[in-house]
């Protein structure tokens, strides 16, 4: 049996797209007969990330060496550029073990929005981390093209999926007539563009994050409902008239295809991530700089064509893409 070792700083109980991707792909790999070991922060002593208490990071990460040697994997994938990822990278290079990596987000843009650290600094760190990998997986064509322009090498496309048993359309979908946002409530998600947008329809926000309390006070007319999962989350998608995605820094956005699977059209900006998924007039609308205009057009999009556009995104395909990218240890 082939054994895959995944080293990741993002894992349950964190709630984000990276965790959804890695936990779901791990499950699919095991269903396909692979043995999968996952080294994650829960196996170490951790501390909450400053300004982000929802995320815990490992601090005794030097124990990683023992866990890698105990695993004896046939393939190694390093998922996140955190303490575990950096330590795993060092171990692999020191022992001449080829590995794959993944760029899940626009991390330099996130850091710039939150801490005002220059893009060149964080892009340089990312290139240092990923260009030593045999292959680096990226979510979309547009993001791949941006990364290649910035000097990243050996990039391989890796899509995303949704759980069709949970996310599916309702013939009466959109009946509640509200605008929906699902995701982290944080400045780097550009969520305030949605919160301050003028609309006759009420707004609902699903999720939590470092900016939640301040936005609850600033926008009392918005319904902040907290984290939702599974069928309860899917009901929010199905009942919404439109799913609004204001982010400028996402590389894909699993929430986008979850919304499509529920038949709910998308409104957002014409940037990497949304522009790789949204087809104008078919499953939503994008605008260069006016979110309200995108919402107005998206509200007229047919919910059936929206749902049909989601069918190419399956976790089985995502797992197959992951398998095809793996590089043998020996």
What are these regions (language model features)?
Residues 124-169:
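Donor nucleotide-sugar binding/catalytic pocket of nucleotide-sugar-dependent glycosyltransferases
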Residues 171-206:
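Conserved donor-binding/catalytic core segment of Leloir-type glycosyltransferases
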Residues 227-228, 235-240, 322:
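Short alpha-helical donor nucleotide-sugar binding micro-motif in glycosyltransferases
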Residues 248:
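Aromatic "clamp/platform" in nucleotide-sugar-dependent glycosyltransferases that forms part
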Residues 213-231:
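Nucleotide-activated donor-binding/catalytic signature segment of Leloir-type glycosyltransferases, i.e.
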Residues 265-268:
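Short hydrophobic beta-strand element within catalytic cores of glycosyltransferases
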Residues 289, 300-328:
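A charged, aromatic-enriched C-terminal amphipathic alpha-helix characteristic of glycosyltransferases
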Residues 162-177, 213-214:
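Acidic anion/phosphate-binding donor-loop and adjacent secondary structure
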